[in-house]
Every structure is written in structure tokens, then in C-alpha cells.
Amino acid sequence: QAVLIEKVRNHANISVLENRMAVDLITGAKLGLTAAAERSRVLGLYVLDQTTGRVEAIAAAHTVLATGGAGKVYLYTTNPDSASGDGVAMAWRAGCRVANMEFMQFHPTCLYHPQAKSFLISEVLRGEGGLLKLPGANGELGERFMPRHDSRAELAPRDVVARSIDFEIKKRGLDCVYLDMRHKGEAFLRSHFPTIFARCLELGINIAEQPIPVVPAAHYSCGGVVTDLAGRTDLESLYAVGETAYTGLHGANRLASNSLLECVVFGDAVAENILAQSRELPAALPPWDETRVTDADEEVVVAHNWDELRRAMWNYVGIVRTDKRLERAANRIALLKKETEEFYSRFRVTRDLLELRNLETVADLMVRSARSRNESRGLH
């Protein structure tokens, strides 16, 4: 990543705009153009400059959505804080199709710690003999529970392990379960898992002496904005790649490492397609209208709604779903969306508000997709 960033910064034809967040795409239809070809074209986007609080209009001959997944829609995720589904939400609002939004892959073991909410505890630890156990009394560990769920115990596929942990946590009202590696010894753990050992030690957990608190966490979005094999979406001059896109590669589940290959292959395909097109910039775009908004007086509402949304998604649209749970989620998300849209129309935008708005859009799409699939398949 560091090498890639350095190459981007040093490239003569790339201008990096930092501390910016996309607000929405600008289409011909949004500007009131009448010709069919112009109405379906993306002309650029509005962008929030987080240092000044001002929204800028940026014209573009071609726009590529590469904003990553939407793991932050859940209470626990291995994704970075920026994984708020921005690209999917913006594309949907602009008129693109999305698909397979119900298929969210969950990793079974994310570290449960307030200072490291997205640190992934590799499945290799279970492959090397790690045991999943319930919390017990007086600070001791309880029983090992995986043999009750699958004959392969801790070596069962990740979806089975994640579902089993989720079952135990929700059935017993637990915060987490524990991955016990103490029987492997400090020398083995330091040599085989140096990064995990060091990070846990920084957080006050010596995994040679203490069990690791873990929870399942949202890991990878298999759905996204529908594209063709060149990364083109339903809108002219708009592309989507990576976890933002639904290319059809992953289907209802993702095989390990295929996501990286997808980024490389489709990233190249998008670049080749853009190079073959005209790169003439559209005419000047209208400025962002702030004549009817003021500074927010109750920003705490955004934080509260964010927390409520993520908890609702975790409880009702998580690893195990039912019609009743999905109905409850749909009702709660509808109320949250209504509140946020009112907030959005009255106050100046902030990063937190934009991310909440996008997360609510993505959450709604996930629930609608899940309710429309009346079968258990893949990750649903």
C-alpha cells in the first residue's frame, strides 16, 4: 500500500485531493437535461472539503467508483471506518442497478476490544489448534462449544464457525467468546503469529497466557453496483470496481483471495475502456446550493442514529436471518432514513451525516434484497 501511494503521488497525471468526501454524483437528469443520452450521463460529482466545510463541484469525463464495501453498516466489522457503502449508495441514488446485496460474508473471529474494533484474528490460529470456548465463572473459561455444532469442530468452514459463534452469543447474551491458544506455548505463538502476538500484547493481551476475546464480524460485500466485464454501470461514463461493484465473479459467496484478483483484473479493464473513450470534460457544473440550510444544532442525532442502525443490522440482518427479523429491520431503517433525510435537507453536510445517509441507503438495499430471496443460499 505504501509503495502504491508513493507511485500515485509521484505520477505527473494524477492530482490527489485529500480530506475530501463525495456527496453525490451529478447526472444530466439531475441538471434537467432533456436529451436521453445526456440524462443518463454522469458529469462529475459534488465533494465535501472537510477542511473548509464547503462543497465543491468537480467535472469529470469519466468517474470510477472504488469506495470499497459497506462493513460499517454492522456493529462489528473487519473493514476500515471508511467502508460505509458510499459508492453503492451514490450509484443507486443516481439510477444504477445493484444486485446481490443480501450476500455479506462474515469472518468468524474479529478481536473484541474497544481500541481495535476491526483487527482480524486469522483463521490460521484455529488451523494450528486454537479452541473456541465460552466464558465461564470467576474469570475462568467455560466449555469448548464447536463440537456441538459440527463434527469438524474449529476446523469447520468459516461460515459454519461464524454462525455457531453468533448462535452462542445471542442465545446466552454474551459480548464475545474466546479463542484459546495458551496450550501452544509462547515460543510457538511468537514465531508463527508475530503480528497477532505483538498487536494483542500492545492491547494488554498476552495470548500465551490469556484467551483472545473474539466476535464474528462483517468482512466482505459480495453484492454491489451492477457492471459489465469492462466495469461499466448503467449510467454513461460511470464505472465501478472492487468491492463497490457486482461483476458476477463471487456469486453468493467469496472464495479466499478472489477479491484481490477481481480488483486487478477489472481495474485494468476499466482503464483500458476509459483510454478508448473521449476524455472531453463536460461544461461547467452548477455550484452546490446552501441557500436553504444552516449549521446543525443537534449533531448528536447523527451519532445516535448511526449506533441504532448498526445494532439493528447486527441483530436482525446478521449471520442468521428470519422473515420476522427482516421485517423489524425494515421498519427501523425506514424511520431512521426519514429522520436523516430531514436532517440532510435542513443542515449543512458533514462527513458523519453523509456516511450515515449512505449506510442507511445500503442497509435498506440489503434488507430489501434479503426479503426478496426466499431461500437459504450462500451467505444468506
Where are these regions (language model features)?
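Short beta-strand to alpha-helix junction loop
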Residues: 1-6, 17, 77-85, 110, ...
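Glycine-/small-residue-rich beta->alpha transition segments that form the dinucleotide
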Residues: 51, 60-62, 66-71, 244
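A conserved beta-strand/loop element that lines the FAD pocket in flavoprotein oxidoreductases
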Residues: 8-22, 98-101
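Core beta-strand elements of the Rossmann-like FAD/NAD(P) dinucleotide-binding domain
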Residues: 52-62, 234-237
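FAD/FMN-dependent oxidoreductases across multiple families
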Residues: 194-239
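An anion/pyrophosphate-binding glycine-rich loop and adjacent beta-alpha core
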Residues: 90, 96-212, 264, 273-280
